[in-house]
């Protein structure tokens, strides 16, 4: 009946979502119900589909594609867009061609693409969340053949950083989809072990040989327990040892040096993760349930998710409350790079800013904070091109140096040549010119932290595990060492391969004296080219790995 038309007494029973009325089979919408012209046109299209469904099923229901999209225009942020005035027609017969184009150009193209604009992974694969959701479900229902799975690259390309959920008006979490896919693949033996093998190896190392826990000296329990995580001390031992000195003196805190389980979580290995969490929970209970002090936002997040009963404190918040702590002014001005998992931890963010401000550094806030540096999800091997794109975008977010408070962010930016400092570099005036530790040095740093803590708190001497190839000495150029670190090849693996080749005689010797050997492990095959300089000393010429296991039989 049109605008201001007859409603036949049905307006009070009108459902604005389904456009139904109290009279069966009678629908009502558009201008008659006070809807503006453009929305009336959209309602006409929607109502046609609702009515079609009604005729087929006898029920009025929203089509699946429209369940979450109604009025999504109201979620959109048009900041930065020019407010253009309505184009006035010069002729009563209608717009000229130029006027029509000018009027059409006023349209904001109101399609919600907030996640697309905030997530390189979504943009890289050009798939919006609804499509990804369907593919994840379909993928999980596929048969036994890995080749039938279509989502492999996408599954392992996600940082699982939570940015998509944080910006989505209705909280769609693509990371949770990809996490489900990873767990499902591992459960059904359709995972790609090589994508996570290196970091699972690190996890196993930090939860075994490098693991250490103790209350304060001569105590059996403690009120506070410092949990620095696994990467902080591996990157710089003083990032653990010096804060612990402070916490022990001020709070009589104990310390637990280990891994929260992030590598197992990102690999979808629920059993490995659960075993680690239960071990930590058991230790925590035995120490009379102390408050845990965190220096890593991701550790804090994992514990909050899986052990919510544990009371938490941030190292940086505690330090910010102590006016005697005045960090060194390593930069005149810097941009604050907040880690993705500190997004909802406003107290940790504030604590770091107080410390940086106390140093006299002028802080610049990033336009789009809390985006993953690229490390998250361990997606680097699954999609090197996307990893490079993400890290470049984060590097370029500001031309100023970065202040970070995540060891992984520090590692990524320093590898990419971005000037940056961890807030603990500032607190303890640590020389930023110190070389980025190699993968081998990171393991040595972690063991050095354990050695010093064990001697100090228990009086015992720590003796690292010994291997038959430890006595081998390798000569590696700086350029090659950088390449090996990029390939995630640790010096110890090269030593083992050379030792194994000498024991078995399985190696190739060329006329110029260069030897080539290989070593097959559970999911990787190593290849090494080297020259023997003298007994027990070798010059490495090149090395690489195939992220697959070569079968030597047949």
How would you name each of these model-derived features?
Residues 126-307, 444-455:
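Iron-sulfur-cluster electron-transfer modules
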Residues 37, 45, 49, 313-346, ...:
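Catalytic cores of enzyme domains
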Residues 231-314, 343-454:
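Cofactor-cradling patches in redox/metallo enzymes
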Residues 437-438, 442, 449-554:
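Ribonuclease/tRNase effector modules and their secretory precursors
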Residues 27, 225, 335, 401-403:
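Conserved beta-strand elements of the Class I
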Residues 107-115, 119, 158-164, 168, ...:
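Short cysteine clusters
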